Amino acid sequence: MGAPTLPRIIPPVAEKLAEARQRVEELREQIRYHNRKYYVEDAPEISDAEYDALYRELEELESRFPELVTPDSPTQRVGGEPLEEFEEVRHAVPMLSLQNARRVEELREWDARVRRLLGPEEEGRLRYVTELKIDGLAVSLRYENGRLVRGATRGNGFVGEDVTRQLRTIRSVPDRLDDDPPGVLEPRGEVYIKLKDFEEFNRRRQERGERPFANPRNLAAGSVRQLDPRVTARRPLTIYLYGVGEGYENFESHSEALAALRRYGLRVNPHTVHGDIDSVIEECGRWAKKREALDFQVDGVVVKVDSREQQERLGAVQKAPRWAIAYKFEPLAGRTRLRDIVVTVGRTGALTPQAVLEPVNVGGVTISRATLHNEDYIKEKGILIGDTVIVERAGDVIPQVVRPVPEERDGDEEEFRMPERCPVCGERVSRPEGEAITRCANVRCPAQALEHIIHWASRGAMDIEGLGEKLARKLFDLGLIRDVADLYELRAEQLAPLEGLGEKSAQNLIRAIERSKERPFDRVLFGLGIRHVGSATAELIAERFSGEELLRGVGVEELTQIEGVGEIVARAVVEYFSLEENRKLVRRLMEHGLNFGPVRGKPEEGPLSGRRLVITGTLSRPRSEISDLIEGAGGTVTSSVSRNTDYLVAGENPGSKLERARELGVPVLDEEGLRRLLSGEERPG
């Protein structure tokens, strides 16, 4: 469609309601048109000054005639008042995750499976579509009669969170669709941040003395999940759409759906249609070479069967469709100088060496810090302070130093030595025999206390909306909280005067803290931050014992009778509940009404029913997601390898668990092997 007529740069203000209504509609139409040209098509037709004049006139008219303000007006993108909590949204069509391929051979194997399942009669009709796998936050947009009525996060694929007001603030998300869309249409896509915007955002945070975000994905996800949509509106978010949920039946193919989305005024992921797998593989290779030139973060190429009818015939396994696969790129790497090694203290007292680097650009992100894991890792790799080193970054994984470049040494390099005293509290540290981690044993160490509060409020534990790291640090530094029990003694009037909060946000935070009392005991147990006790282990223990029983004294022998709880975990639990400081904390939490009752176990059956699996190393998706898949298939995830372990799922850098599995003869699976078990293509041995 052509551009609507531009107004005068200094327009007269309409005085009559009827005249104002007509002018408001004209302005909204013009602004939507130019939003599409600028944010979707990247082809602006007017100057910023001209656009600002349109916007100012609309603001002035809506101010004079507030009855003309509508939720889908361009002026309403600023966000509105904060929410008290996110409401759940059940996806009518599940937002499935994808199988992964890391080698070309795996793409060919997938192609062969697709052809085998479709049969020879479909050979001539089979087409593939490739599109970039953007590293952001997956969301869905529901339009009814062309108007945006709801936006939601992917969540677990079946239930997400309602983030409509947050997504409305994104300029590339239109409130109304062009052309003639179906009555119900649910485009799906990835919210992300361009690399240059990410760098600028972090630069400003550092100037204000705030901690920078680790990567663009974390910033995008955190921005959308802000209870206050005004915060979202200030973040430089954009979106690419890659598919359709509800309403997909209106299209014959994926490529047809993408073309329609573009016609409706939505930003569509760059994509190509292919006639065979060789062409797909060539395209993956081209993007692998070009990815560092892109202005957004990608971690692979998604390959999809184009025909909707063929997709339906292929179906899905567990949480992944058979008709799509993600080809993952190799991790990005850069070369820089290791200036220093500093030591940080975590919530369990673990001292972790961290590399201080000369800033280096890796995949469009400037990296100045990277993990060195532990003292043994540094020695095994032969890393010296002052070395030239190779740094890798894969997806949202923390950057890591993978090796030094010894040939570039000049003799001024120094060996790293782990400090003998905690760098925060000054107490002596120790490294237990057989462990790789040096620890501060002072339970009153401020660094441990703060990290414990941050962990307690996290989504996997008590999920306290609005209590992020920044606010937790501020409350801790002001002396308002010293441990997690103090959270339940906070009052809104204490919080409201704090910079960046205010009365409404303070009340919302207090409500969120109160709601955390409803979390089941396994979440509380995980939130306590006991060494070796992850979310899966906490669930196993909480199914057998209550908090009161653990306080009274449950022995190592009783705990190890729980399937999946080994001696190391059991001793850690017993030690935790034997320390008077911890017992006082648990008693206070009980007095505040938190849930310490046992959790009823869930009967499970599936292809991994009765099997015990351990996960180790870096995987292509979050470990919690892998655990969910295993447990959804009837399996149990445990934390340590023993003779009772049926499988070890090993990613990159698997560590000592892989050696232990080999010693005991435990079968080792990569992600593809696990996928075959989950899908039923292979039966457990």
Curated annotation (Swiss-Prot):
- Family annotation (SMART domains): BRCT, HhH1, LIGANc
Q: What CDD domains is this protein classified in?
A: BRCT_DNA_ligase_like, LIGANc
InterPro entries to which the protein is assigned, alphabetical? BRCT_dom (IPR001357), BRCT_dom_sf (IPR036420), DisA/LigA_HHH (IPR041663), DNA_ligase (IPR001679), DNA_ligase_AS (IPR018239), DNAligase_adenylation (IPR013839), DNAligase_N (IPR013840), Hlx-hairpin-Hlx_DNA-bd_motif (IPR003583)
Q: Which GO terms describe its molecular function?
A: DNA binding; DNA ligase (NAD+) activity; metal ion binding
GO terms under biological process: DNA repair; DNA replication
| Superkingdom of the source species | Bacteria
What's the cofactor?
Mg(2+); Mn(2+)
The Gene Ontology CC terms held by the record are: cytosol
Q: What is its EC number?
A: 6.5.1.2
| Binding, Zn(2+) | C422, C425, C440, C445
**Which residues are listed for NAD(+) binding in this entry?**
D48, A49, E50, Y51, D52, S97, L98, E131, R154, E190, K304, K328
Reactions the enzyme catalyzes: NAD(+) + (deoxyribonucleotide)n-3'-hydroxyl + 5'-phospho-(deoxyribonucleotide)m = (deoxyribonucleotide)n+m + AMP + beta-nicotinamide D-nucleotide
Q: Which residues form the BRCT domain?
A: 603-685
Enumerate the active-site residues.
K133 (n6-amp-lysine intermediate)
Keywords, sorted A to Z: DNA damage, DNA repair, DNA replication, Ligase, Magnesium, Manganese, Metal-binding, NAD, Zinc
Per the record, a Pfam family? Answer: DNA_ligase_aden
EC top class named in words: ligase
- Fetch the Gene3D superfamilies from UniProt: 5' to 3' exonuclease, C-terminal subdomain (1.10.150.20), 6.20.10.30, BRCT domain (3.40.50.10190), DNA ligase/mRNA capping enzyme (3.30.470.30), Helix hairpin bin (1.10.287.610), Nucleic acid-binding proteins (2.40.50.140)
Question: What is the recorded function of this protein according to its Swiss-Prot or TrEMBL entry?
Answer: DNA ligase that catalyzes the formation of phosphodiester linkages between 5'-phosphoryl and 3'-hydroxyl groups in double-stranded DNA using NAD as a coenzyme and as the energy source for the reaction. It is essential for DNA replication and repair of damaged DNA.
Say which family it is in.
Answer: Belongs to the NAD-dependent DNA ligase family. LigA subfamily.
Protein name stated in the entry: DNA ligase
User: Per the UniProt entry, what species is this protein from, by scientific name?
Assistant: Rubrobacter xylanophilus (strain DSM 9941 / JCM 11954 / NBRC 16129 / PRD-1)
**Classification lineage:** Bacteria, Bacillati, Actinomycetota, Rubrobacteria, Rubrobacterales
